[in-house]
């Protein structure tokens, strides 16, 4: 079986780097050298150009805004993107990584307003739209240089030279085209609707923008319950001595009361009345308790009216308005019936302000309130929504003119009290939507906007969503699927300045209506209207105000007086980012074949909230334009927070500058921390400020990999070995070599499975970066702490034997393959090792291909080798645990270990060669196997009652009785039987019980492998003099080796050793184990004294062994 097609004869050559790094800052230095190597040798460019153009892997790099610095969320997204792109490149694909910039929209405008000292649309218009937009254009890339520095330093490869910008003419023209296509498909319309409105930004928001970045947060509102006086008594409700009938209404927005035009009741609610001072108050029966509680608390005398009040007796009754601003409105101030009114909160009666509530608007429009033609949008909006762009009342609300609506609540309540209309006020804590740009509470207001009719294509979007592989998988039917099911039409227009303009021209005379929509600048397609064709002027900038100056006579006006003028709105910047797949290529004007052949994208990733942002807008436009999902695979990663679960912010000072972390520890450590965490597929990462978690990655991941390389180079240099990559597993005969080779192949396959295997039936969805990272960590743990440690004596051998060369070749081979397969996840450190080991296959590891193991099938004996080795590693861990708990030194030999097997043939029939490895590793002389496990442990059975209740709920009492009487048995086939075979009994399924073992000896431990119980081991702790002396000899070897290291001796240096002690057991030990000690420590002489003149060892290095009253001296020869 061939691992590679050709035999690699590769000479190991050390390069200029120091191989003995100890601190994280050293790894940072290595990374900087590697970054320079990549740059000088154009490795990134070569990684693309070296791949076949016809074998592409497409991923979309979502455009960030460049008017702020990157944060940890950007870094996380970048790490995932770069890892997948590197992996697919090494899998043989061409992966273009074109970077993009989001240039338009509120972030740019808000920064410009702040720096220019202008605020609000009127101030901008006075300042000049041209000057304002030019400032936006020049400032939008303010931090692009810093972005490039961050991205480069995180070892992320992107193409900045061919980047796209949403403000580029080509990008904007593709957006025009897409709008035109939607218009032609009947998916665009203009309408007045209630929309979430940011008065701080003076613009409406999309409905999904109120659902991202935790836009909902707690807000305390002042509520009021007030009385509206009916002008007539309710039908069939004539009560003696009643002077007035009043309807109680509860509202959390007192500021909307000046704009009240109707009241709404429900046909599904029972109403009742209560009399106070000869006035009857009407409200829902569900509110009665609240009413009575308030009256008692405030000593208000009341009388409950007998019987219910039917909603029909209230319908269409007129009432006296609280304010007189709209007294002239026809059809207003009536009680209307509506299904949306509920009695969960409030009085079961709702006040209607059609300019500030969706239900209010729809109901009043249906009833002709106000009686204004929908075509006269300006008059209608001025009537029902009398506030300016900044959220202040206009002159129509004369008592509160120029006051912000939120600032009028107290005054309005005071007026209600003065008119004796206020029944009750309260503070109300509730979740309220805020502007995700400014953190200010939103207003819901009526506005005229342009919409994509998403509801028309909603069902198709739901169908296409089934074709997308979401990671984590629950996003498909959960967060994203539910969002699609409730999708609403999308308001895509913004009455702002810096953005792609809506390509819509309308007649300025409603008597001669006409609408023109354009889909291109020049005439390219016969069926698409072009701007230059109609306006007969060359166009090189689509931005305002230049585009607003394009005016022409209305062709449908025979008088020739009316003109076609552009609507002043610009696109929602989410429409622009959602157009990125085709707009970055200037489709369909250029790159038509390229786009159509490779759409949809293979992969995309952003944080999970983009299910209601970018992922959603991509999906809407892709479905509407191409009837396809926009991507095939999508990772929704989580959020990086501080250790208290709070967002990272400058105000809280709860995070470190990423660049400082990179400078101290390198970016590979931060990358691997994030990739190996659940944050890489939807969880949240709680990141400490001090870099402890990053240091842990250095210690637990990067150093083990580096130490493997370092170990090889040290001894290969000494022996001047020309190591080679082993090409055939069959040529490996050493059991440890065979094991680590098989483990390497198994690890590579597990990484491939994690990254590529898609099998929904078994829960595999590919792109499992965390699982791939875990496989890498586990392998290098085994390589360092098992293979290298177990094989050190082979490398230390003074002779260049075949076995020694085989060990070198084995270590070299697994490093070769593991460096390759780890490269996407640890790009810099693997590159450093690749360069240092001089594999001479490719100039860079990132230009090489992933290991080819398609033709490798591990034989049964290979699989068994792995199984046996994992078993003894597990047993070693159990023995070490007992030694630690019982304070028995690892170097102290013990006489015997007894293993009691529990239904495990591997444990009972462990081959002798594995027994020998086990005994040597745990420092025990002999091993005994037994099957009577009950002699040393007792079983404890625990039933899983929820699972049993699903299958045999009627037998639960019987099962409990049998369990209490301890009537159960493990059958020969491994099944568990509760009861006795001759009588009542039940065979339990694996998930219906747990079987534990309780050991009876303090020197015993259960043996498990994964979830499976294998048996029990017992350690014999009896010590003889011979065992004690051997332990002392091993301790002496350890302190000699430590002294060599402390004094910076080379591993090949020969030494003299002098021991001074009066301990008889130590002297006997040295005598008995002399050859062992000198061989292990490269000692040419070893002398022991009871007393010693210090002058005789003045040139020696001194150390002590206190527990044996021993002083040791060594000298390099």
Curated annotation (Swiss-Prot):
UniProt comment concerning the protein's domains: IleRS has two distinct active sites: one for aminoacylation and one for editing. The misactivated valine is translocated from the active site to the editing site, which sterically excludes the correctly activated isoleucine. The single editing site contains two valyl binding pockets, one specific for each substrate (Val-AMP or Val-tRNA(Ile)).
Top-level taxon in the UniProt lineage: Bacteria
Designated name of the protein: Isoleucine--tRNA ligase
Gene that produces this protein: ileS
Gene Ontology BP, a term: isoleucyl-tRNA aminoacylation
InterPro entries: aa-tRNA-synth_I_CS, aa-tRNA-synth_Ia, Anticodon_Ile_ABEc, Ile-tRNA-ligase, Ile-tRNA-ligase_type2, M/V/L/I-tRNA-synth_anticd-bd, Rossmann-like_a/b/a_fold, tRNAsynth_Ia_anticodon-bd
Alphabetically ordered keywords of this record: Aminoacyl-tRNA synthetase, ATP-binding, Cytoplasm, Ligase, Metal-binding, Nucleotide-binding, Protein biosynthesis, Zinc
Quaternary state and interactors: Monomer.
A Pfam family assignment: tRNA-synt_1
GO CC terms, sorted: cytoplasm
UniProt-annotated binding residues for ATP: 650
Span of the annotated motif 'KMSKS' region: 647-651
């Amino acid at each position: 079986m061939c691992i590679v097609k050709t035999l690699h004869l590769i000479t190991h050559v050390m390069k200029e780097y120091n191989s003995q790094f100890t601190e994280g800052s050293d790894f940072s230095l290595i990374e900087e050298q590697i970054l320079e190597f990549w740059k000088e040798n154009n490795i990134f460019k070569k990684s693309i150009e070296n791949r076949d153009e016809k074998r592409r892997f497409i991923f979309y790099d979502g455009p960030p805004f460049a008017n702020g610095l990157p944060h940890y969320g950007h870094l996380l997204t970048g790490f995932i993107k770069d890892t997948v792109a590197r992996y697919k490149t090494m899998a043989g694909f061409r992966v273009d990584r074109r970077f993009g910039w989001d240039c338009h929209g509120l972030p740019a405008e808000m920064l410009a307003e702040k720096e220019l000292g202008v605020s609000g649309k009127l101030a901008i218009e006075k300042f000049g739209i041209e000057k304002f937009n030019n400032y936006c254009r020049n400032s939008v890339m303010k931090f692009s240089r810093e972005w490039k520095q961050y991205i480069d330093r995180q070892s992320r490869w992107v193409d900045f030279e061919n980047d796209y910008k949403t403000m580029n003419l080509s990008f904007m023209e593709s957006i025009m085209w897409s709008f035109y296509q939607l218009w032609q498909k009947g998916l665009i319309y203009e309408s007045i609707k209630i929309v979430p409105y940011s008065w701080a930004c003076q613009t409406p928001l999309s409905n999904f923008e109120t659902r991202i970045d935790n836009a909902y947060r707690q807000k305390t509102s002042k509520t009021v319950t007030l009385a509206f006086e009916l002008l007539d008594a309710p039908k069939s409700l004539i009560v003696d001595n009643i002077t007035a009938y009043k309807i109680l209404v509860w509202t959390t927005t007192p500021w909307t009361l000046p704009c009240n035009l109707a009241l709404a009741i429900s046909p599904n609610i029972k109403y009742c009345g209560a009399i106070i001072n000869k006035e009857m108050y009407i409200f829902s029966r569900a509110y009665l308790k609240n009413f009575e509680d308030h009256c008692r608390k405030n000593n208000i005398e009341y009388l409950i009216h007998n019987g219910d009040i039917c909603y029909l007796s209230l319908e269409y009754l007129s009432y006296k308005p609280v304010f007189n601003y709209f007294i002239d409105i026809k059809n207003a101030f009536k009680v209307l019936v509506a299904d949306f009114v509920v009695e969960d909160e409030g009085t079961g009666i709702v006040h209607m302000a059609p300019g500030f509530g969706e239900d209010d608007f729809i109901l009043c429009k249906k009833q002709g309130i106000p009686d204004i033609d929908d075509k006269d949008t300006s008059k209608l909006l001025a009537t029902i929504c009398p506030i300016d762009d900044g959220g202040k009342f206009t002159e129509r609300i004369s008592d509160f003119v120029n006051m912000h609506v939120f600032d009028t609540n107290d005054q309005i309540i005071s007026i209600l009290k003065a008119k004796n209309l206020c029944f009750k006020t309260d503070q109300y804590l509730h979740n309220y939507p805020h502007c995700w740009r400014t953190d200010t509470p939103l207003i819901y207001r009526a506005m005229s906007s342009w919409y994509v009719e998403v509801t028309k294509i909603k069902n198709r979007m739901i169908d296409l969503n089934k074709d997308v592989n979401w990671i984590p998988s629950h996003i498909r039917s959960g967060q994203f699927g539910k969002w699609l099911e409730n999708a609403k039409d999308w308001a895509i227009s913004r009455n702002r300045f810096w953005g792609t303009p809506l390509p819509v021209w309308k007649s300025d005379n409603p008597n001669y209506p006409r609408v023109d929509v354009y889909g291109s600048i020049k005439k390219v397609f016969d069926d698409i209207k072009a701007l230059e064709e109609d306006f007969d002027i060359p166009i090189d900038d689509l931005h305002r105000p230049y585009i607003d100056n394009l005016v022409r006579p209305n062709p449908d006006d025979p008088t020739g007086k009316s003109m076609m003028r552009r609507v002043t709105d610009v696109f929602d910047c989410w429409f622009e980012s959602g157009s990125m797949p085709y707009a970055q290529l200037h489709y369909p004007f250029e790159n038509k074949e390229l786009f159509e052949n490779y759409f949809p994208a293979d992969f995309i990733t952003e944080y999970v909230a983009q299910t209601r942002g970018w992922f959603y807008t991509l999906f809407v436009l892709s479905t509407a334009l191409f009837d396809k999902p926009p991507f095939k695979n999508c990772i929704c990663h989580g959020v990086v927070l501080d250790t208290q679960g709070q967002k990272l912010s400058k105000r809280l000072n709860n995070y470190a500058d990423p660049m400082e972390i990179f400078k101290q520890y390198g970016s590979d450590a931060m990358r691997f921390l994030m990739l190996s965490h659940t944050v890489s597929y939807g969880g949240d990462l709680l990141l400490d400020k001090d870099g402890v978690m990053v240091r842990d990655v250095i210690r637990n991941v990067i150093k083990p990999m580096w130490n493997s390389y370092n170990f090889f180079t040290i001894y290969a240099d000494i022996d001047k070995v020309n190591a080679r990559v082993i090409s055939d597993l069959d040529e490996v005969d050493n059991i440890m070599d065979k094991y680590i080779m098989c483990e390497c192949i198994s690890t590579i396959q597990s990484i491939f499975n994690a990254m590529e295997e898609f099998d929904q039936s078994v829960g595999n969805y590919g792109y499992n970066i965390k699982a791939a990272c875990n496989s890498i960590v586990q392998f290098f743990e085994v390589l360092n702490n098992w293979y290298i440690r177990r094989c050190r004596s082979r490398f230390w051998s003074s002779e260049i034997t075949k076995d020694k060369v085989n060990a070198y070749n084995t270590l070299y081979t697994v490093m070769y393959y593991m460096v390759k397969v780890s490269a996407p996840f640890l790009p810099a450190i693997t590159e450093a090792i690749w360069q240092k080991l001089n594999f001479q296959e490719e100039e860079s590891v990132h230009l090489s291909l992933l290991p080819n193991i398609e033709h490798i099938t591990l034989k049964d004996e290979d699989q068994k080798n792995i199984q046996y080795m994992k078993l003894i590693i597990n047993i070693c861990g159990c023995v070490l645990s007992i030694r630690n708990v019982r304070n028995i030194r690892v170097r102290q030999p013990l006489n015997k270990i007894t293993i009691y097997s529990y239904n495990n043939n591997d444990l009972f029939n462990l081959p002798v060669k594995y027994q020998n490895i086990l005994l040597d590793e745990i420092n025990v002389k002999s091993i005994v196997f037994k099957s009577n496990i009950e002699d040393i442990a007792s079983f404890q059975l625990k039933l899983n009652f929820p699972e049993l209740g699903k299958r045999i709920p009627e037998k639960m009492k019987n099962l409990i009785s049998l369990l209490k009487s301890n009537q159960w048995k493990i059958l020969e086939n491994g099944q568990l039987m509760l009861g006795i075979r001759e009588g009542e009994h039940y065979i339990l399924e694996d998930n219906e019980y747990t079987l534990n073992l309780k050991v009876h000896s303090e020197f015993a431990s259960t043996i498990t492998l994964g979830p499976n119980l294998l048996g029990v081991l017992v350690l014999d702790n009896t010590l003889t003099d011979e065992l004690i002396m051997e332990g002392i000899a091993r301790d002496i070897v350890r302190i000699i080796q430590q002294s060599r290291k402390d004094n910076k001796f080379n591993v090949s240096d020969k030494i003299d050793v002098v021991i001074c002690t009066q301990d008889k057991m130590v002297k006997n030990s040295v005598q008995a184990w002399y050859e062992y000690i000198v061989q292990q420590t490269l000692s040419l002489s070893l002398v022991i004294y009871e007393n010693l003149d210090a002058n005789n060892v003045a040139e020696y290095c001194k150390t002590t062994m206190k527990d044996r009253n021993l002083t040791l001296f060594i000298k390099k020869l």
